[in-house]
Amino acid sequence: MNISKLNYFFTIIVLSNISFFIGANYFPDENWNSASPESQGIASSKVKKLIDLTFLDDATQGVVIIKNGVIVGEKYADSHNMLSHGTSWSMAKSYYAALIGISIEKGEIQSLDDPVVKYLDYFNDERKNITIRDLLDMSSGLEFPDHEHEKMFFQESHLDYAKSVKYEKDPGTKFEYNNANSMILGDILYVATNKKADILLEERILKPIGITDYKL
């Protein structure tokens, strides 16, 4: 597989064992090595079962299964292949989390426990005790109305919608998957770095790890 051609925005990557990142001799470059499941200590039947499960709902565009740093299983929907571009959807949440971590390492953000209001003045209301950690943990306590995901999706400005979401419960008390949290994280990154999240993603994640075939 040519990693420069692989679009991480649509491919689901299942890490059956992530410990290879620590002290491993092999790390993928432009050509990611493949191997039989058995050579990596896993049965082919289990890999096939996992792949079949991911395609049951006809919504999966592609899946890659990695064991010990090598590809042991790979399949794409009929309308896609390893060169296809797709929509990342909620993968953005993982990218936001990584970018927040990088900003902390660079000293642009002091701590996960910083209150959001330290960076965003518009949180100086009943939301003032919400922290960056609460946003990342999906426990911000921001209101989560029925069909929130659909409501945000069809707004002209997703950020403006997220800014308007009201306080509902104490932060850190309940996990509630809420897209508004991620939009607020993007705004924090902009204030801390003076760069939009898509630019940060390109500069700090995609280019450094060699991903060249993408659309933002």
PLM features per residue range, with description:
Residues F10-I18:
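Bacterial N-terminal signal peptides
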Residues K106-S140, S164, T193-L216:
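Active-site helix/loop module of the DD-peptidase/beta-lactamase fold
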Residues T87, I100, Y122-E168:
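Extended ligand-binding groove/face enriched in aromatic
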Residues M1-F10:
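Bacterial N-terminal signal peptides that target proteins for export
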Residues G69, G86-L112, L135, L185-L189:
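Active-site SXXK
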Residues A24-A43:
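Short, compositionally biased leader-like segments
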Residues L50-H80:
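A short, well-structured edge-of-sheet supersecondary motif
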